[in-house]
Amino acid sequence: MSRAHVLLATFPAQGHINPALQFAKRLANADIQVTFFTSVYAWRRMSRTAAGSNGLINFVSFSDGYDDGLQPGDDGKNYMSEMKSRGIKALSDTLAANNVDQKSSKITFVVYSHLFAWAAKVAREFHLRSALLWIEPATVLDIFYFYFNGYSDEIDAGSDAIHLPGGLPVLAQRDLPSFLLPSTHERFRSLMKEKLETLEGEEKPKVLVNSFDALEPDALKAIDKYEMIAIGPLIPSAFLDGKDPSDRSFGGDLFEKGSNDDDCLEWLSTNPRSSVVYVSFGSFVNTTKSQMEEIARGLLDCGRPFLWVVRVNEGEEVLISCMEELKRVGKIVSWCSQLEVLTHPSLGCFVTHCGWNSTLESISFGVPMVAFPQWFDQGTNAKLMEDVWRTGVRVRANEEGSVVDGDEIRRCIEEVMDGGEKSRKLRESAGKWKDLARKAMEEDGSSVNNLKVFLDEVVGI
C-alpha cells in the first residue's frame, strides 16, 4: 500500500508559514508524505528540513513575480493578482506532474491557507478533496461568515454592541476584524468573500483550525455548514507536548538575525524570574516614529528590564531619541527566537500586536499579555484575550485615536506586572489556559484525537 500524500499550499508570510510548517511536521510524524507548496521568496528563506519530518516533507516553490518579497512601494493589488494567476498555473503543473510520476506516491488531498483559496478550485479540477487551514481563531471565521450571511447591516451600522449568533461575545467596532471596518479597502473584504464562496462549493467543508476545543468551544460549532476541526496549538513539540525534543523551531523564519541578536537568552538569564517585559509587534507591523517614542517612554517610566524587537528595513537604523537611556534598562534587537523568549523563566509579560500565532503561543506558555492590536484579526484576538480568556489587558489609544500614549502603555504593563490583585488573577488565568493547551496535545488530548479522526477519514490512516 502506497503512503498517503498531502499537498499543503501556504501564503508566503511568516504568520502563515509557521503554523503550516508545524502542521506539515504533524502529518510527517503520522507517516504521511507532504509536498509543501509556497513562493520562491519564502522557500529561499526557509529551512529545507523540518524537525521530525523523517524525510517526508519536500518543498515545491513557484515564482509569484516578487522573488525578493513585497517591497515598500510595491503595488499590493498587483502582488495578489500575480500570486493568484501564477500560483494557479504552478499548482496545476505540480498536480499534473505528480499524476504521471511513477516514483512518487499520488497526492490525494490538498490543504491550503486562507489567502490561497484558489488552491481548492485547482484541487477540484483534479478531482481532489481539500480542507482550509485556518490560522486565526475560529471566532474570526465566524464573524466573517455571519457578515456575509445576513448580519452585514448590523455590523456596518457602527454599533459598539454587536450581537451575533453562535455564542460569540458582544463586539464593539474595535473588536471586529479590520477587513470589515469602513476604513479598510474593499479588496480586502473581497478576499474574505472569495474564501467563503470557495467553501460554499463543497458540502460540509472541513476547516482545520489552529485552536483547541477548550479555548473556543462555542465558536468551533457556531457555523452549521462547516466542520471546524481544532488541531492546535500548532507549536513545535519541544515547547508543548515534548514528544520530539529536537523540534525546537518552526523551521521557516523569513527574517535575518542582526549582529546583536544571538545573546538574547544570555541577557534574559541575567534578570530575575518573571521580571522582563517582552515587546514585539510581529512581522508585518510598521510602527510609526511617534508611536515608537511613546513605547520607549512607557518602558522607561516602568523602569523594568525589557526585550524589544524592532524590525527595520535593510540598511536602516532604529531611530529613537532616548536610545541610550533604553540601552541602560533593556535590550533592543531586530530578531529573536520568540518561542525561547516566551518560555524563559525571566519573562513577566508580553506586549504584543495580538497576531494569532503570538497570542496562541502566549496562551500555551502561560504568559500574560498587554494587547496592542493593529489590524486584521488582532482586535478580535485582543477582545478574546481580555474579556473571554482574561489573560491580559488591552491598551486604549489617545483621543486622536492614532497613538497609544506612553502613560497608557506604562499603566497596562503595571496592571500585569505589579503583583496586585488584578495581576494575580491574570497570572492564574494564564496558568489555567497553559494547562489546557498542553492537555489538548497529550496522547489522548482533544487536538490529537481530532487530527487522528480527520486523517482516518480523508487519507485512510
From Swiss-Prot:
Coiled coil: none annotated. Residues 1-15 form the signal peptide. The keyword Glycosyltransferase applies. Its EC number is 2.4.1.298. Keywords: Glycosyltransferase, Signal, Transferase. CDD domains: GT1_Gtf-like. It catalyses: an anthocyanidin 3-O-beta-D-glucoside + UDP-alpha-D-glucose = an anthocyanidin 3,5-di-O-beta-D-glucoside + UDP + 2 H(+). UDP-alpha-D-glucose binds at Q338, H353, W356, N357, S358, E361, D377, Q378. Pathway: Pigment biosynthesis; anthocyanin biosynthesis. GO terms for molecular function: quercetin 3-O-glucosyltransferase activity; quercetin 7-O-glucosyltransferase activity; UDP-D-glucose:delphinidin 3-O-glucosyl-5-O-caffeoylglucoside -O-beta-D-glucosyltransferase activity. GO terms for biological process: anthocyanin-containing compound biosynthetic process. It comes from the Eukaryota. The keyword Metal-binding does not apply. Catalyzes the glucosylation at the O-5 position of anthocyanidin 3-glucosides to form anthocyanidin 3,5-di-O-glucosides using UDP-glucose as sugar donor. Anthocyanidin 3,5-di-O-glucosides are molecules that are responsible for pigmentation. Also acts on anthocyanidin 3-O-(6-O-malonylglucoside). Much less active with hydroxycinnamoylglucose derivatives. No activity in the absence of the 3-O-glucoside group. Belongs to the UDP-glycosyltransferase family. This is Anthocyanidin 3-O-glucoside 5-O-glucosyltransferase. It comes from Verbena hybrida (Garden vervain).
